């Protein structure tokens, strides 16, 4: 029978009696536990009792309470949804401020209280049947024993908690990553017909049909004719209606032969690369120290020859000398008029006209130098553009050996230092040329040695390009180096043939090669002077000479030419290279037309 409470006083007295019966089994001596440190905030000070708010309108089971008191057992006296701790108690304030969502604590017993998870709004000491004191079991009168299977949230160690949280975060992040990857996958469409693209083909995203069509077009005949106005619509449904417009659109969207992705590699290429890397790794592991030291000086027998059938490499020293002597250009006469006095314009006009005509014969001479004709057209143009003024100057110095203090520009044009004063800045160049001619005369340079030195200048001029050069370097450097070695051997053969000792041969070879650096310095000075004359419009330059001057400025650093650095455009580079190549073919005179025997 349930009765409604009419007064708080009677209810409170009965409540204290019930609580005393419930706490009677727990009134044992306090558990003395060794404590490594002071109690933390999870334990409540027992000196501060909690305030219990009596619920209004709560129902009390008198019969059940009396029966429970007589039997000495505990029983629930209030419903689970009616008893709560007062919000004004210190225990409630502690739980709200420090532990957030954890249940509030009471400090009735002197024993430490664990953080429990009771059902909602239930007192820790008023539980349903079978759930009273869930985490402590009474085994002995003087001690408590911890249950083996405690609540996971409380009895899991910190490391386990961290691992579990890490696994949860990992799984959630992987799920998010998968969702992001799925959303990142976008559908590609063909740039030609707007169909679904199957991949990146010939430089654009395209479908299999357009890829195959473009492949057939570039490999076979593509002389398609449009039956209309060359403006047909190319889409998924009408791409086969007009082959001409389809091919036109392929080119418009950027399809090109060889337009593949640079980062793409086939399985066969990767397999070969792995095999090659494994083989190189085994070779490196098995190589000893003395073999590594021997590799610093590779034997000529193990050098890979790219020009195995080059006739220049099979020539003997005498044959090389004979070929170089036969390739020498003829002497050219100038347009000098002795009746007219020299002026700056007239002298520069004579010299530039003479140099322009000599350039034509220089191209034909270079074609007949052993080994030069085996190079590709790019390397031939590159070497001539770098060495043309050095070759003209060493020829001038060689002709002037028999005329001390004078320079023989042509058989009918012999100038001394005083005559060079009429041109601004010419005296310095004249002095350097006269000093080199005097050095040749002192060394008694022979004609065979001269032709070898001139060939070395041609082949060695563009081998070591400047870092600031805008043009690409030589493509067949190995072949050029082998031809240079052949010419050096020819020089040594000539010295040995003249009866010089080994020490004298080495000394003379070093002296001759040192003169080449002086000629390079004179060439740079002459190029700078010629460019300044061009900028001042002192004399108009001829086509081939002007082209060679501009090409030389592209090879050399701009700061050396005395002008601020200027980055040439791609069109200028292409025009210069193509024009120079055209000049090699235009000004090339076959040896048979000049009456020179072709010995190569």
Swiss-Prot record:
Residues 316-552 form the NR LBD domain. GO terms for cellular component: chromatin; cytoplasm; euchromatin; Golgi apparatus; nucleus; perikaryon; perinuclear region of cytoplasm; plasma membrane. SMART domains: HOLI (SM00430), ZnF_C4 (SM00399). The modification Phosphotyrosine is found at residue 542. Residues 35-47 are annotated as: Required for interaction with NCOA1. Residues 35-179 are annotated as: Interaction with DDX5. Signal peptide: none annotated. A zinc finger (NR C4-type) spans 190-210, 226-250. One of its GO terms (biological process) is negative regulation of canonical NF-kappaB signal transduction. Residues 159-170 have a biased composition (Basic and acidic residues). The modification Asymmetric dimethylarginine is found at residue 265. Pfam families: ESR1_C, Hormone_recep, Oest_recep, zf-C4. The modification Phosphoserine is found at residues 109, 111, 123, 172. Keywords: Activator, Cell membrane, Cytoplasm, DNA-binding, Glycoprotein, Golgi apparatus, Lipid-binding, Lipoprotein, Membrane, Metal-binding, Methylation, Nucleus, Palmitate, Phosphoprotein, Receptor, Steroid-binding, Transcription, Transcription regulation, Ubl conjugation, Zinc, Zinc-finger. Residues 190-315 are annotated as: Mediates interaction with DNTTIP2. Residues 148-177, 558-581 are annotated as: Disordered. Phosphorylated by cyclin A/CDK2 and CK1. Phosphorylation probably enhances transcriptional activity. Dephosphorylation at Ser-123 by PPP5C inhibits its transactivation activity. Phosphorylated by LMTK3 (in vitro). Ubiquitinated; regulated by LATS1 via DCAF1 it leads to ESR1 proteasomal degradation. Deubiquitinated by OTUB1. Ubiquitinated by STUB1/CHIP; in the CA1 hippocampal region following loss of endogenous circulating estradiol (17-beta-estradiol/E2). Ubiquitinated by UBR5, leading to its degradation: UBR5 specifically recognizes and binds ligand-bound ESR1 when it is not associated with coactivators (NCOAs). In presence of NCOAs, the UBR5-degron is not accessible, preventing its ubiquitination and degradation. Glycans are attached at residues 10, 576. Residues 190-255 bind DNA. GO terms for molecular function: 14-3-3 protein binding; ATPase binding; beta-catenin binding; calmodulin binding; chromatin binding; DNA binding; DNA-binding transcription activator activity, RNA polymerase II-specific; enzyme binding. 17beta-estradiol binds at residues 358, 399, 529. Its main location: nucleus. Expressed in the CA1 region of the hippocampus, expression decreases with age (at protein level). Expressed in the uterus (at protein level). Nuclear hormone receptor. The steroid hormones and their receptors are involved in the regulation of eukaryotic gene expression and affect cellular proliferation and differentiation in target tissues. Ligand-dependent nuclear transactivation involves either direct homodimer binding to a palindromic estrogen response element (ERE) sequence or association with other DNA-binding transcription factors, such as AP-1/c-Jun, c-Fos, ATF-2, Sp1 and Sp3, to mediate ERE-independent signaling. In the absence of ligand, steroid hormone receptors are thought to be weakly associated with nuclear components; hormone binding greatly increases receptor affinity. The hormone-receptor complex appears to recognize discrete DNA sequences upstream of transcriptional start sites. This is Estrogen receptor. The lineage of its organism: Eukaryota, Metazoa, Chordata, Craniata, Vertebrata.
